[in-house]
């Protein structure tokens, strides 16, 4: 085969890549569209004549994959975390103060990389030796869906990096979105064909990325803006600032947002926020705020992460959009713990890209605060552009036939008494698991991903099983068989087998998951894990008295009482024993041994300003020493750790004769024990 054909093919590919880079990344087209199309057709014809020379990174190969049966799962090597939100100047000030507290640098001296917060879908794109190899959705942050074939169809994403010296592995993280003009054109075409339209550009982008047929995705006007780097393997070091890393990505052909800038000091951050907010309607794509990131990578590393978000970044969201509508009715829903929640039934209204017909009224106090009545004209807001809320009533529009909202005194589901404990805002049904609504929600919680993770059993299946009275308690799930499931509506052979396999798989769990799945009020994931780590076995937890329970990290008086009372209820014990009898099992946790030290098993209070540790670090250190950390000084307090400017707690401790330790003494204890 003539060598000139290979050379000609590569020349055409490089030229087309260059044109794509200038068009999609630099927004500076080098040639008319007709010339681009001519070269693309020339390349297609040559590759058709010489199929053995087609490469996976050729511009012609954006759409070539066959339709998929479903999306495979991909585990992110580095979790794709979400961001904490700020909704006001006070929230921004709090964010900056937390940074100052952690790294002891005045926030007005810290440079931030400021970006618009695009309203799209977060994705991860992996390049291996410069070639696009894999792409995934964010998913739950740990696991996403394989959307490689669809990502390859997006025109402003290079299939091959624009460099002769690519990193061995480079993971680009960014937001896929649909520009407003493309969204409008897509809906116009759908209307012309009599097809369903999309509510907003974000939904359109999500639906396009999750098409099983990449050819459909290729017809959708999607774009990417990169915002970070994940996995990176190369002999070359990355730039030392976030901004410079984004500019480096741009040189590789990866598109980044044109509005990104640097700012130092709270006034400059607020000015950027206001500038982007003013430009919001003219940008041509949807945004819902700004993202502010500490620019220096070394400072990012010092600040670190909390469980679900980095400490060095925040999403400063725009005020939610508001609209007026009519309150037609109020329904009262019963939750898993018996909480009675009033739900407003609204005349449908379009707010922030979504049609809203329901909104929570939270509780009876909120109804009184708003002074709301059925028939009122209300102001609806999507808080954070996500959760619909009623924020006010237009009193002058109240009709003569407006009807006062009566909070129920009996459960709307089981007719049990509704009570409100003094000091709590929520009224609750007293029916417990006698109440069908509580039982249903408890079962939904039991099978949920963070509990027993029975992914073949969804909410609709739970509802159908309960309606037919085939299950009453969690243990009944493990008694289901193939014949029973096949009698259900819309239950096929495959679905029945998947459900039974998921149920069987769920029998092997962990003590923490099992505790969380039981749905004990106020026992969340973290508390369940702390209980498992502290006690090691279920029997030890069941036998613990109130004082023993309160020794567990983050378990106070209220949670200890909830736990203790749970095990005093014979029905709860029966449910747990039935689950174990059905084969639910886990490995006992070996409790961590804490070396003997003067602070072990003591109650300690922190006060004042610490200079070497943050408050969270000091608390964690005390817990490693086996202390119970309390928030207030009492006669039961053994030690007070006093930092600078200690106030009333120090005075009270001295009055009660509590031993006072300095921050240095605390660190000294810890250093002695671990060394």
UniProtKB/Swiss-Prot annotation:
Cofactor names: Mg(2+); Mn(2+)
GO biological process: DNA repair; DNA replication
EC number assigned by the record: 6.5.1.2
Catalytic activity: NAD(+) + (deoxyribonucleotide)n-3'-hydroxyl + 5'-phospho-(deoxyribonucleotide)m = (deoxyribonucleotide)n+m + AMP + beta-nicotinamide D-nucleotide
InterPro entries assigned: BRCT_dom (IPR001357), BRCT_dom_sf (IPR036420), DisA/LigA_HHH (IPR041663), DNA_ligase (IPR001679), DNA_ligase_AS (IPR018239), DNA_ligase_CS (IPR033136), DNAligase_adenylation (IPR013839), DNAligase_N (IPR013840)
Chain segments annotated as transmembrane: none
CDD domains assigned: BRCT_DNA_ligase_like (cd17748), LIGANc (cd00114)
Function: DNA ligase that catalyzes the formation of phosphodiester linkages between 5'-phosphoryl and 3'-hydroxyl groups in double-stranded DNA using NAD as a coenzyme and as the energy source for the reaction. It is essential for DNA replication and repair of damaged DNA.
Assigned protein family: Belongs to the NAD-dependent DNA ligase family. LigA subfamily.
Protein name: DNA ligase
Organism: Glaesserella parasuis serovar 5 (strain SH0165)
Organism lineage string: Bacteria, Pseudomonadati, Pseudomonadota, Gammaproteobacteria, Pasteurellales
Gene it is expressed from: ligA
